[in-house]
Amino acid sequence: MTQQKLYISDVTLRDGSHAIRHQYTVEQVKQIARALDDAKVDSIEVAHGDGLQGGSFNYGFGAHTDLEWIEAAASVVKHAKIATLLLPGIGTVHDLKAVYEAGVRVVRVATHCTEADISRQHIEYARHLGMEAVGFLMMSHMTTPQHLAQQAKLMESYGATVCYVVDSGGALSMNDVRDRFRAFKDVLKPETQTGMHAHHNLSLGVANSIVAVENGCDRVDASLAGMGAGAGNAPLEVFIAAAERMGWNHGTDLYKLMDAADDLVRPLQDRPVRVDRETLALGYAGVYSSFLRHSEMAASKYGLKTVDILVELGRRRMVGGQEDMIIDVALDLLKQQEHERIRSEPVSSEAN
């Protein structure tokens, strides 16, 4: 494993968009893409945080369109492939054709971990266009390793040449990661690659990525300064430093990544991307990481604690795409608080 070239997939310009509410400027995209390309990452994923056509009232509107961001990145990249993310039902095959013409050569088709069957049309069309099609199984902690592997097998049968364990909630332990990659290797074709997309909500983003590689993972997602939803993704520069110390062949320039993380990306964070009370609650409760900023807004609006909203979302097993339910949960918590207040009030009695 130490001699095999790891495929380094950067997600700063897609998952990282969540951290700043999808407000990257075109110039920022160019600067970051140029720095990543100069550091020789293998692919650079570009899109709204929720994938192609993710800009909406539900998810939040971006400062620019997906095509504007993609064209900006493609205009400065010489080495890396431009990648993007598509959620079936949000992005369409028409969007795939448009981004292919704009320079995208890798598409990650993302579904909930038990819904791989909805990816067929988009994976098949991506292959028809000549794109590399990647199966991306989100919230992978919410099903068993064996069932997850069967879902990956479905994506493989549709034409995916890579299948990912996606820890959207940052809730997987190192043993959980190991078990999922072993299950993948048991059922997927030898030529089908596997990938790891970690989140750092339990501070395990880098550790889980290392365990994944130790169990046969071919591709690792990471972002500069951990820029991503929740407590962020595995910080790219940290993972590369660890990989370097372990003697792994990653092919990137560590110092250029360190400079880009601190000089270009960290200054953009209006809310620090870190493990804190709220982002820890995401990992603890197993909640979709991009729910963070939406839950913070709801908590502020209704005078609630963000942690209480996140824990309740986890209890209800909400998944990506159910952002509209965050307000429902907040209102339910308000009602519950009001009922508890009424019950706790002393009952007044009139004197005879």
From Swiss-Prot:
Binding site for Mn(2+): D15, H197, H199
Positions of transmembrane segments: none
One GO MF term attached to the UniProt entry: 4-hydroxy-2-oxovalerate aldolase activity
Chain positions of site Transition state stabilizer: R14
Catalyzed reactions: (S)-4-hydroxy-2-oxopentanoate = acetaldehyde + pyruvate
Binding site for substrate: R14, D15, S168, H197, Y288
Known pathway: Xenobiotic degradation; toluene degradation
Disulfide pattern: none
Catalytic residues as annotated in Swiss-Prot or TrEMBL: H18
CDD domains the record matches: DRE_TIM_HOA
Gene Ontology biological process terms in this record: L-leucine biosynthetic process; toluene catabolic process
Record key words, sorted: Aromatic hydrocarbons catabolism, Lyase, Manganese, Metal-binding
SUPFAM superfamilies per record: Aldolase (SSF51569), post-HMGL domain-like (SSF89000)
Pfam families for the chain: DmpG_comm (PF07836), HMGL-like (PF00682)
EC number: 4.1.3.39
Root EC class: lyase
Residues covered by the Pyruvate carboxyltransferase domain: 6-258
Homology family: Belongs to the 4-hydroxy-2-oxovalerate aldolase family.
Name of the protein this chain belongs to: 4-hydroxy-2-oxovalerate aldolase 1
Organism whose genome encodes this protein: Pseudomonas putida (strain ATCC 700007 / DSM 6899 / JCM 31910 / BCRC 17059 / LMG 24140 / F1)
